[in-house]
Amino acid sequence: MRSSLRAWQRRCIDAALEHYSATPHFFCQATPGAGKTRMAAELALALLQQGKIDLVLCFAPSCQVVDGFRTTFSQVLGQRLDGLIGAVGDVCTYQGMEHRTEAFWKLFDEYRVFAVFDEIHHCAGHDPLLSNAWGQQILQRVQDQAAFTLALSGTPWRSDDRGIALARYSNPEGRLICDYRYGLREAVADEVCRSPRIVLLDNHKVKLTEELENDSSTQVFPSIATLLRGSPVSYEDLLCHDGLLNQLLGLGIEKLDEVRAIKPDAAGLVVATNIEHARQVALALAARGESYRVVTNRTPDAQQVINEFKSSDCRWIVAVGMISEGTDIPRLQVCCYLSRIRTELHYRQVLGRVLRRTGSTDNLAWLFVLAEPTLEEFSQRVADDLPEDLAILTQVQVPAMGLETPTDDMTAISQVEGLASKDSDRHAGTNVESALSLSCLEAPPIYQISFSQHYRQQLLVVC
């Protein structure tokens, strides 16, 4: 099957096989959407055919990624990867490692195991004193026991600056050493990934009104950035503003229309802040006649909803804490980023959901985001595969902890498809002067914010 591999995948496999002749640990950084899972499966096949391993055990950050790994590896290896009798191996989540029995870990002592770790940056484990629970499992159970390991990541750094399990860092600089690197620029040039187009939405006349008992005062800000710097308004407040939300969604809908004229099954992703926010987004899409699905970290049978969306004609999927890294929905080509999470790791992983290229006509990916200063900075350097300030390991003293996963205690939205009439106007104008209370639990509101009809769009052509 190697004849159907991409050039970078063949080069990486060859590099790994040569590397394994001297050392058992191989670290691969490849841009999201490049095809890391397929490469890993083909590498496992090569090791099996060479008689160097007996079992393949894979670990991944989520159930969605586990399912994808199991499917891809089974297809490539021609054997089951379900952990049952007769299988060549198994796949489990990092969280599931903590619940594995001693019989599972004895496999590393009794067999030659090839251990594959997807999105390894979730596992802090460079220093035993600073490792999280998942990193400790790798350090104690796998690192010295596995015949070979393959660590994969598209974004090999952590938001807490701790070192990554199975990673090597230069001394004294503390710079991450990758055994193989395949960046976004290369992937776009090789027509493996779509070229990202990031649209930053801004407004040149934002009014903030402070209402007092007997008086009120109004300030006008020339941009979202100045509003956030010079007022009590937070980024989270803006995400819930109906006018701004509708404007951003409108841009996404318009772009999806253009894309579907060329690629009829193309779809869009909206990353929402929490479950209530997802409900607000869903209502806005319904008002425009858009078909949609909602999937959250509280949705029953969430994986089934995602799987059905993959092969459906539904235009949008609204997600909270579900569709980020590793989730493979190739028809996603447009994304509206409305998450409250502002870390570069999360931002790049979300962008990666629309980068996977499937043909000759889907060469562009579109991301729409508010012109918030931090997100604008992230956008400007998307083409930098390993940002200088994130590539350095610094010494930090923090307690061991698990994965930083956004949680939400609200009641889950039912998994429904938008039922708005297709005859309604999907491009209706937005209420550009709608007001937002900054004190959601108090009445009457103290501050109100409104946006003029004069929105600005900045298009970033990344690579």
What are these regions (language model features)?
Residues 273-296:
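Conserved helicase motor "Helicase C" RecA-like lobe of SF1/SF2 P-loop NTPases
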